Structure formats: C-alpha cells, structure tokens
Amino acid sequence: ELANALEALGVKGIQLGGFGHFRDSGMAGSPSHENSRALVNRIDEAADFLGEELEAIDPHAILTYGPDGGYGHPDHIAVHKVVMKAASPSVRIWYGIFDRAANYAGLETLDAPAGWTKPSQEYLDNFTNEGADVTVALSDAALDAKRRAMRAHASQIWLADGSTTRTNPASAVAALHEPERVPGAFGLSNLLVMPLLPAEYFQLGQGEPADDLLGGL
C-alpha cells in the first residue's frame, strides 16, 4: 500500500533500516506497544538512521507530524520525535494538520454514506488542529494524486466515491452538496465520514515564518 501511494504521489520512499525493521507500535497498552522492536521503543535508533539520510539529502524543508501525532497515534508521535531529534536546528519544519475550521465547514456540505455517520465534536477536535500557518491549494492533478494515494491505503482509508477495492468490496457514496468546495469524502475503519479537501494545511514547527512552504529558501 505504501509503495503504491508513493508511486501515485511521485515520491521516492526510503525505508529506515529496511522494510519491517521497525514494528508498528499499536496503541498504548497493547502488546504491540510493548514490543522491543516497536518504533516507540527505538526513537534514538530511528533518529540515527534518519539523520544520515537528511545529511545526504540536505533538505530545504521537512514535512512531518506535530507533537500530538495528528490524532494521537503513538507511531505518529514517535515520528515527530524522531524528526525533531534528527533534523538540523536550522532546517524549516512544517507539521501537516487537519485544519479544524476547514473540516467542520466541509462536513456541513456533505451527507454520510449509508451505514456511515458523521463524527462527534469530541472526535473532530481530537482529529483536527486549529490555526494553519500555510494553506496549499491543490491543482486538479495534485488532487487526483491525493485521491489515488489515499485509495492505495485500502486497509486504512475508504473513499466514499463509489469505488471498490479488494479490502472494501462494497461501494460507499457520500452526497456532496458543494463539490467545488469539498470534492470528496472518506472514512477510516470506524466509518466516520470526513471531507476530502482540495488543500493541505501546515503549522510551522521550526524555522523562520513564511507565507508558503519554501518561501525565502
């Protein structure tokens, strides 16, 4: 799934230590979380691997999770820690977020597919963040790549556009009342519908403020 998503985005992937070197950490309290090979238990090792890659790449900017890991998943939080430990203090770092206002507004423009529901305020507030510093509007081509990358993660994401996969063989269709503003919808395995927005949102985590991701670099 990851390889297919990277291909859809035109991104070259680097697997730190090789595929399977770091194990999924699961949620706190689970056996996976206690596994000595889990990413959450190997932050320093992962940071060493990443530091070597960053030294070779010398990036102008880094996109990663914020301190909350997006919605609190331990592996996402671990990735944040690894990046902050490995990155040079001078490199600009952006946290990718689900913008709270944009997602609340987006949900108002759609109806959930049959059998799905809209998320509660508690869920939304945990899933989203307030105050994006930079909003990147997506071109039609970029939005199409985003859809294909999301569809590639069939065990994680279900697009509510009528498409099917081997993982999700039954189609689901959300009613989109303002498709120019919200051109799609998706859900996780919990079948809570979320708007698929034609933009990406970022908060500045490190470096000089800018009006766009590479501004002034």
Where would I find each of the regions flagged by the language model?
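C-terminal accessory domains and tails appended to enzymatic cores
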Residues: 11, 27, 52, 57, ...
